[in-house]
Amino acid sequence: MEKMRQQLMEWGKELETFRLPHWEELPDLELYMDQVRTLVDRYLSPVIQGEKHPLLTSSMVNNYVKLGLIPAPVKKRYNKEHVAFLLAITTLKQVLTIPEIKEGILFQGKTVGIREAYNLFCDEQEAAVWMVSQLAQGKSHPQKF
């Protein structure tokens, strides 16, 4: 039990510095599918662990295009808008259904625009992960602000 508690505290400490790239920090160049998948995995692996399957597959991306969750790539290349959508979808699908995610993305996109919606998503995710990190370290009633 003590070893598990120690591992939880170490994981909590690692999560303290977790950050998602905000819109301005996303790559400005066009990427191929494998590069996008690697990037999404790199950004999200600190918070989505223990999966025996990849966080994002080519089939998933193609399905998201077919379902209208993300725009189609241009000449098999993906831009920062695609990466932002895929980071949000991959994170949110851990707790929401695809139809719920689509509804939320469409609503937020229309309300504040894609950039602002994505940056708000990043801020909220970082705050939530920070809270989890504090609880994992045994700190009761953590407050960031």
What are these regions (language model features)?
Residues 2-108:
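Basic helix-turn-helix/winged-helix DNA-binding cores
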Residues 104-145:
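Intrinsically disordered, low-complexity, charge-dense segments enriched in Lys/Arg
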